[in-house]
Amino acid sequence: MEDLALRPKTLDEYIGQERLKQKLRVYLEAAKARKEPLEHLLLFGPPGLGKTTLAHVIAHELGVNLRVTSGPAIEKPGDLAAILANSLEEGDILFIDEIHRLSRQAEEHLYPAMEDFVMDIVIGQGPAARTIRLELPRFALIGATTRPGLITAPLLSRFGIVEHLEYYTPEELAQGVMRDARLLGVRITEEAALEIGRRSRGTMRVAKRLFRRVRDFAQVEGEEVITRERALEALAALGLDELGLEKRDREILEVLILRFGAGPVGLATLATALSEDPGTLEEVHEPYLIRQGLLKRTPRGRVATELAYRHLGYPPPVGPLLEP
């Protein structure tokens, strides 16, 4: 319930994504002026950047209802038909998270719904089977995905608007922390909020989570104001360093450096050495390490950079293998 209370309701309250918000204001005003539903919108970007929150904001700005579901939850066309025919009114928004995980059968039934607001359902089997056409309310579909490359071309072509969410700056993340603190009645200094923002991996969801944990530490210690010093102590207790690396992130780099001489080493070999699932390593940990310049993916395998050596306090080797 606390997260719902903190969720922004308008584009002005939504922090960050300024270029996207500027375009959305145009799209929303145009739709309202024409008294038409918003064009179908696809939002893509890494997890935790606020795609679901943005869908709620758009619905609130338009004054329409929002129906939230996910790709894996729509297993067959009947599931989709039930949502479209029974849960939506004219102008409402259907939000499908992880839309890249829609089944092929459900996706094919979504095409005419998006284009013509109709859906054909087959009733019965064999010679007695018959097709019923459902007339649907004119709705707007907002799809969200962290894997845009898995969106099929036919589905992608049916979105009138395709937008990318970017990582947040530490300053934007600090603004988010300050906003949550204000709404929760928690006193925190701007310096403390910025330290949280710097360790939040460019992700608002992480910033909100870290703020709640820092608040826990301050509350238990009886602190009335979360200062920079208190925030740093709490963040250190959580195992985060100044780049926001967690214990597991540092272990990945240490194994690369100490066991494999910085690499290159294959994903499967590295995962085995860490007793980690290769998918978790590749999708959860590596993107941030790569973005921070601590790790590289090469045709021969993973390589720790000179920056990784310096961050962990190891003297970098001399040679052409590692690049800063």
From Swiss-Prot:
Residue numbers binding DNA: 297, 302
MF (Gene Ontology): ATP binding; ATP hydrolysis activity; four-way junction DNA binding; four-way junction helicase activity
UniProt-listed Enzyme Commission number(s): 3.6.4.-
Top-tier EC class: hydrolase
Region of interest (Large ATPase domain (RuvB-L)), residue spans: 1-168
SUPFAM superfamilies listed in its UniProt record: P-loop containing nucleoside triphosphate hydrolases, Winged helix' DNA-binding domain
Annotated Gene Ontology cellular component terms: cytoplasm; Holliday junction resolvase complex
Region (Head domain (RuvB-H)): 242-324
Regulation of activity: The ATPase activity of RuvB is enhanced by RuvA.
Summary of temperature dependence: Optimum temperature for ATPase activity is 70 degrees Celsius.
Record region (Small ATPAse domain (RuvB-S)): 169-239
GO biological process terms, semicolon-separated: DNA recombination; DNA repair
Record-linked InterPro entries: AAA+_ATPase (IPR003593), AAA_lid_4 (IPR041445), DNA_helicase_Holl-junc_RuvB (IPR004605), P-loop_NTPase (IPR027417), RuvB-like_N (IPR008824), RuvB_C (IPR008823), WH-like_DNA-bd_sf (IPR036388), WH_DNA-bd_sf (IPR036390)
Keywords from the named record: ATP-binding, Cytoplasm, DNA damage, DNA recombination, DNA repair, DNA-binding, Hydrolase, Nucleotide-binding
Binding site for Mg(2+): 52
Cell compartments where the protein resides: Cytoplasm
PANTHER family reported in the protein's UniProt record: HOLLIDAY JUNCTION BRANCH MIGRATION COMPLEX SUBUNIT RUVB, PTHR42848
Reported function: The RuvA-RuvB-RuvC complex processes Holliday junction (HJ) DNA during genetic recombination and DNA repair, while the RuvA-RuvB complex plays an important role in the rescue of blocked DNA replication forks via replication fork reversal (RFR). RuvA specifically binds to HJ cruciform DNA, conferring on it an open structure. The RuvB hexamer acts as an ATP-dependent pump, pulling dsDNA into and through the RuvAB complex. RuvB forms 2 homohexamers on either side of HJ DNA bound by 1 or 2 RuvA tetramers; 4 subunits per hexamer contact DNA at a time. Has Mg(2+)-, DNA-dependent ATPase activity; dsDNA and supercoiled DNA but not ssDNA stimulate activity. Binds to linear dsDNA in the absence of ATP or ATP-gamma-S. This subunit can promote Holliday junction migration alone in vitro. Partially complements an E.coli deletion for UV sensitivity.
Free-text comment on this protein's domains from its UniProt entry: Has 3 domains, the large (RuvB-L) and small ATPase (RuvB-S) domains and the C-terminal head (RuvB-H) domain. The head domain binds DNA, while the ATPase domains jointly bind ATP, ADP or are empty depending on the state of the subunit in the translocation cycle. During a single DNA translocation step the structure of each domain remains the same, but their relative positions change.
Protein family (similarity comment): Belongs to the RuvB family.
Record-given protein name: Holliday junction branch migration complex subunit RuvB
Gene: ruvB
